[in-house]
Swiss-Prot record:
This is Heparan sulfate glucosamine 3-O-sulfotransferase 5. Changing residue 155 to A: Reduces enzyme activity by over 99%. It comes from Homo sapiens. One of its GO terms (molecular function) is [heparan sulfate]-glucosamine 3-sulfotransferase activity. It catalyses: alpha-D-glucosaminyl-[heparan sulfate](n) + 3'-phosphoadenylyl sulfate = 3-sulfo-alpha-D-glucosaminyl-[heparan sulfate](n) + adenosine 3',5'-bisphosphate + H(+). The chain crosses the membrane at residues 13-32. GO terms for cellular component: Golgi membrane; membrane. Sulfotransferase that utilizes 3'-phospho-5'-adenylyl sulfate (PAPS) to catalyze the transfer of a sulfo group to position 3 of glucosamine residues in heparan. Catalyzes the rate limiting step in the biosynthesis of heparan sulfate (HSact). This modification is a crucial step in the biosynthesis of anticoagulant heparan sulfate as it completes the structure of the antithrombin pentasaccharide binding site. Also generates GlcUA-GlcNS or IdoUA-GlcNS and IdoUA2S-GlcNH2. Coiled coil: none annotated.
Length: 346
């Protein structure tokens, strides 16, 4: 009887030991892959924090990919927040636009960087009078938890075209960094139309064809009252921003290139934000089914953008496309001149 009990005990210990070793190997593989993918950047010199790299180890990235999510959902106690030195910071950079330029893709890709924490939702603080009236503390409380050495980034594409926004952001932080992601103006306008059209179709509502909206039927000229066209006149909106911020505080991201060659564009943004280069080609892989790049955080966690990305655009009369591109051309040239970035749009 004693022999049987000892044999049973040895068997149980063997099973438990195997499970423990397996769990340990899994943990080592996971943490090792995270460290290899995104080693923590030496951010103490960049943002003036007191921590050294030794004091700011892999745990920051682990929290960023896991526990920070719990804090974001409000599942953390005040003691946990205090224990991990977590704070809700005002953004040090904002993606201000442009709608249908790739703002969501840019935000998600920048979130690959271990020193970046993104606001998950569009907050619409500066463009919405009701939200703005709630005050800056309300806005800060909408931000995700982060370490003091990390930077928070939010995006609300309506900011770029809303008249009151530049002054409001200036009053919050006159030295903030501003990201503008743009696409070829005619393509962006058609994408804008496509999103609205899809919403109408879901509600079984009829909607005019793009050609009828973009071209004034009375004059046969481009209809600048149509919002999708007006939004694509980038230089008109940028000039309003330049009344408050110098051009050095803006960085233009090529949204068309971000689709086909994301890494070079992300590296330019890292440089603009004074971030050490941490996003690599390993973080980005092409999904042939979806037709665009997806994100690889580590060997376990991958992420593709929502299915609404990469919508099929409707066929548009080539003569209308030609007319629109001719209309946008002088505005594009001025945009290149102001920003110092030539995008070679047709």
């Amino acid at each position: 009887m004693l022999f049987k009990q000892q044999a049973w005990l040895r068997q149980k210990l063997l099973v438990l030991g195997s499970l423990a070793v397996g769990s340990l190997l899994y943990l080592v593989a996971r943490v090792g892959s995270l460290d290899r993918l995104q080693p923590i950047c030496p951010i103490e010199g960049r943002l003036g924090g007191a921590r050294t790299q030794a004091e700011f180890p892999l745990r920051a990235l682990q929290f960023k990919r896991g526990l920070l999510h719990e804090f974001r959902k409000g599942n953390a106690s005040k003691e946990q927040v205090r224990l991990h030195d977590l704070v809700q910071q005002l953004p040090k950079a904002i993606i201000i636009g442009v709608r249908k330029g790739g703002t969501r893709a840019l935000l998600e890709m920048l979130n690959l960087h271990p020193a970046v924490v993104k606001a998950s939702q569009e907050i619409h603080f500066f463009d919405n009078d009701e939200n703005y009236g709630k005050g800056i503390e309300w806005y800060r409380k909408k931000m995700p938890f982060s370490y003091p050495q990390q930077i928070t980034i939010e995006k609300s594409p309506a900011y770029f075209i809303t008249e009151e926004v530049p002054e409001r952001i200036y009053k919050m932080n006159s030295s903030i960094k501003l990201l503008i992601i743009v696409r070829e103006p005619t393509t962006r306008a058609i994408s804008d139309y496509t999103q609205v059209l899809e919403g109408k179709e879901r509600k079984n509502k009829t909607y005019y064809k793009f050609e009828k909206l973009a071209i004034d039927p009375n004059t046969c000229e481009v209809n600048t009252k149509y919002k999708a066209v007006r939004t694509s006149i980038y230089t008109k909106h940028l000039e309003r921003w330049l009344k408050y911020f110098p051009i050095e505080q803006f960085h233009v991201v090529d949204g068309d290139r971000l689709i086909t060659e994301p890494l070079p564009e992300l590296q330019l943004v890292e440089k603009f934000l004074n971030l050490p280069p941490r996003i690599s080609q390993y973080n980005l892989y092409f999904n042939a089914t979806r037709g665009f790049y997806c994100l690889r955080f580590n060997i376990i966690f991958n992420k593709c953008l929502a299915g609404s990305k990469g919508r099929i655009h409707p066929e548009v009369d080539p003569s209308v496309i030609t007319k629109l591109r001719k209309f946008f051309h002088p505005f594009n040239q001025k945009f290149y001149q102001i920003t110092g970035r030539t995008l070679n749009w047709p």
